Amino acid sequence: MYLLILFLPLLGSLISGFGGRWLGCRGTNTFSTLCVVVSSLFSLLAFFEIGLTNTTCTIFLVSWIKSGAFYVSWGFLFDSLTVTMLVVITLVSSLVHIYSIKYMENDPHQPRFMSYLEIFTFFMLILVTADNLIQMFLGWEGVGLASYLLINFWYTRLAANQSAIKALIVNRVGDFGLSLGIFLIFWVFNSVDYSVIFSLVPLFDNQFLTFLGFKLHVLTLISLFLFIGAIGKSAQLGLHTWLPDAMEGPTPVSALIHAATMVTAGVFLMIRFSPLLEFSPTILFILITFGSLTAFFAAVTGVFQHDLKRVIAYSTCSQLGYMIFSCGMSCYDVSLFHLANHAFFKALLFLSAGSVIHAVSNEQDMRRMGSLLKFMPLTYSVMLIGTLALIGFPFLTGFYSKDFILELTQISSYSNLQMSYISFACWLGTMSVFFTSFYSFRLIYLTFLNNTNLAKSSLNLVHESSLLMIFPLIILSIGSIFAGYLIRDLFVGSGSDFWGAAIFILPKHSTFIEAEELPIVVKWLPFILSLLGIFFASFVQIFLKTFYFKSNLQNLLSFFTFLINKKWYWDVLYNRLIVLPILNFGYSISFKILDRGFIELSGPYGFTKFVSFWSQILIKLQTGQITHYLFFMIFTFCSFSIILVYSYINLTFNLLLLFFTLFFFI
Amino acid sequence: MFQQLNCTNISSLLFLVSLLGIFLNQKNILVMLMSLEMMFLSISFNLIFSSIRLDDIIGQIFSLLILTVAAAESSIGLAILVIYYRIRSTITVELMNLMKG
């Protein structure tokens, strides 16, 4: 059953990919959806068996690479962490499958689409179930590949090609860090198995590595490399630029990749490696810094984006920041809790955005929407549920995880815990709550409540989506309402032993109980801020309609609007400072000077030139005059005899002259 | 008795003069042939001197053979020269550059 969870999506992918021609659209849709749905049912069963009854299941399939101390097997590890991810992935994936049957019905390449979705799910499952780093890396790379295929699904579009390549390459930067981490782990631990690594970690706490005269803490270095991998995959600040561009793919793809699966891989890696990260305070600090900066940055950037999907993408980025800094606070279980909840409401948001886009004839710009409330009340309701869950409205899913994370950051107000660096996360996280609710409600207003800006021709075509698209929305909105409440006690309840050995927290880093003792004012703060965000968004939308568009009231404001709308010029800076110089280097130095220049000159081109040049000179020597020939002969004879004489004296001199003479003789 | 050094000097001087005569001469091919003959002469002179000096008959036999070879050679050379003169009606060495590379 456990292996079926994995291999059903693979089977579905292969059959719908290779047999799509014979099965047809309807056949592949039915088959692949069935595969994923059965897989998700099995993973629910696995969640019950492993999570609720508190066991761990390891499966050894077959050995893979065996070379000296390096031993990799196809092994699968199912513990509570894995099964939680399994449920999230397969559930969202099967809902996305059902959704895209209808969403993609007019697409001529639907079997291909289904096949890609399935292979994506399969690789993600490989990633979470692996019991060693190599197999995890297989899933990691496979997910990147599948994301390339999916973002590039409409391969005739230039923008889709560009953003798919960007996604793959930016991810590859992180993957490079991850592979360095894997090498280092093997070098230190002589093994790539999770069980071996995690049980050996405390022994290596005092291990140092001398590199270029610097003494580096080995565990810090390893976790730094792993975190670089997570930066790439989870779109943290620095390598986040691929995520908003990846919206070029079809909307169900965005829901799958950017809500539930791919971007969570980085967070999953951090949570999986909690036994290692715990021993390195430096890396925890880095996690907090990066995570909170990402959360704040993305939340602010989302405010002035005009693309419906891009707003949600930035929101994803922001929430990933929350998860990462929650890991940095050693609250891995809360991070995973937020991950699971976030999968529900973010998939809901994406899919309902897809529903909106589908209804308004593929218009994605929010400024050209409006007053869709009358036409699509159900989509409005589910989107509102998703939004409220996202901003952490009380008693919805987001409240239980997001507000809990923020509550944990407030711990920094206790000065005697020596955790003052958390205050960084506290301030930035709390501020981004305001921006989160602001852009979420801006989205709601612009799409559903404001006067319409749609063309009349497309307004006539606005319709509520069909049942197959509604059904996943309803399931997800039920999940967004209840999931947090239902699994709260299991995941983060005080004293819950659900996680078992899957997550390790050093006792001195554990601050759960202290968070319960916070003053009530501090606990109310995030909620008040998000309400403020809602009010501010409503105020701006109702009374200051020209706030976004005619913001040339003050130069400063328009400057900031422009800056934020252009995503703080990250892309421009990257292009100017990194991409363009590298391309220039590749063309003018590596290609022009080295490949076509130096190597050609010393290789074939230069050699032929050399030979023909000297042959021209030698031809000149053959004048046809007998006396010249005679002169050469006699000269050669004389110098040859001189050399013979000298060869008894000095050997090197001899050789030199021998060549000289032979040259003339020729 | 001949001085050993003196005789060697004469023969090698003769050889050198004929050598220079071959390739310093740009005009006349007859001079070239004559230098060639002189070269044979110097060599056979050297051989005869060595045979006397070493008290060995082989050197004189060699010089006799060289005389015949030189005679045959000069006759063939002159024949070639005559044929060449018939065709080109000139025997200037400078103008013999048909085999230019």
Curated annotation (Swiss-Prot), chain A:
Reaction catalyzed: a ubiquinone + NADH + 5 H(+)(in) = a ubiquinol + NAD(+) + 4 H(+)(out)
Family that this chain belongs to: Belongs to the complex I subunit 5 family.
Entry coiled-coil feature ranges: none
EC number(s) on file: 7.1.1.2
Function according to Swiss-Prot or TrEMBL: Core subunit of the mitochondrial membrane respiratory chain NADH dehydrogenase (Complex I) that is believed to belong to the minimal assembly required for catalysis. Complex I functions in the transfer of electrons from NADH to the respiratory chain. The immediate electron acceptor for the enzyme is believed to be ubiquinone.
GO terms (BP aspect): ATP synthesis coupled electron transport; electron transport coupled proton transport
Taxonomic lineage of the native organism: Eukaryota, Rhodophyta, Florideophyceae, Rhodymeniophycidae, Gigartinales
Membrane topology summary: Multi-pass membrane protein
GO MF term list: NADH dehydrogenase (ubiquinone) activity
Gene Ontology annotations for the cellular component aspect, listed alphabetically: mitochondrial inner membrane
InterPro entries assigned: NADH_DH_su5_C, NADHpl_OxRdtase_5_subgr, ND/Mrp_TM, NU5C-like, Proton_antipo_N
Ranges that cross the membrane: 3-23, 31-51, 59-78, 82-101, 119-139, 168-190, 211-231, 251-271, 283-303, 311-333, 337-357, 375-395, 421-441, 467-487, 524-544, 572-594, 629-649
Species of the source: Chondrus crispus
PANTHER family: NADH-UBIQUINONE OXIDOREDUCTASE CHAIN 5 (PTHR42829:SF2)
Keywords (A to Z) from UniProt: Electron transport, Membrane, Mitochondrion, Mitochondrion inner membrane, NAD, Respiratory chain, Translocase, Transmembrane, Transmembrane helix, Transport, Ubiquinone
Entry protein name: NADH-ubiquinone oxidoreductase chain 5
Gene3D superfamilies membership: 1.20.5.2700
Domain of life according to the entry: Eukaryota
Subcellular location field: Mitochondrion inner membrane
UniProtKB/Swiss-Prot annotation, chain B:
Cited HAMAP family: NDH1_NuoK
Gene designation: ND4L
Record-linked PANTHER family: NADH-UBIQUINONE OXIDOREDUCTASE CHAIN 4L, NADH-UBIQUINONE OXIDOREDUCTASE SUBUNIT ND4L
Gene Ontology BP term (one): ATP synthesis coupled electron transport
GO molecular function annotations of the record: NADH dehydrogenase (ubiquinone) activity
Listed EC numbers: 7.1.1.2
Keywords assigned by UniProt, alphabetized: Electron transport, Membrane, Mitochondrion, NAD, Respiratory chain, Translocase, Transmembrane, Transmembrane helix, Transport, Ubiquinone
Annotated catalysed reactions: a ubiquinone + NADH + 5 H(+)(in) = a ubiquinol + NAD(+) + 4 H(+)(out)
Family membership: Belongs to the complex I subunit 4L family.
Membrane topology: Multi-pass membrane protein
Alphabetical list of NCBIfam families matching this protein: PRK05715.1-2, PRK05715.1-3, PRK05715.1-5
Main location: mitochondrion
Protein's cellular compartments: Mitochondrion membrane
Organism: Chondrus crispus
Function (record text): Core subunit of the mitochondrial membrane respiratory chain NADH dehydrogenase (Complex I) that is believed to belong to the minimal assembly required for catalysis. Complex I functions in the transfer of electrons from NADH to the respiratory chain. The immediate electron acceptor for the enzyme is believed to be ubiquinone.
Record's GO cellular component terms: mitochondrial membrane; NADH dehydrogenase complex
Taxon lineage: Eukaryota, Rhodophyta, Florideophyceae, Rhodymeniophycidae, Gigartinales
Taxonomic superkingdom: Eukaryota
Name of protein: NADH-ubiquinone oxidoreductase chain 4L
Record-linked Pfam families: Oxidored_q2
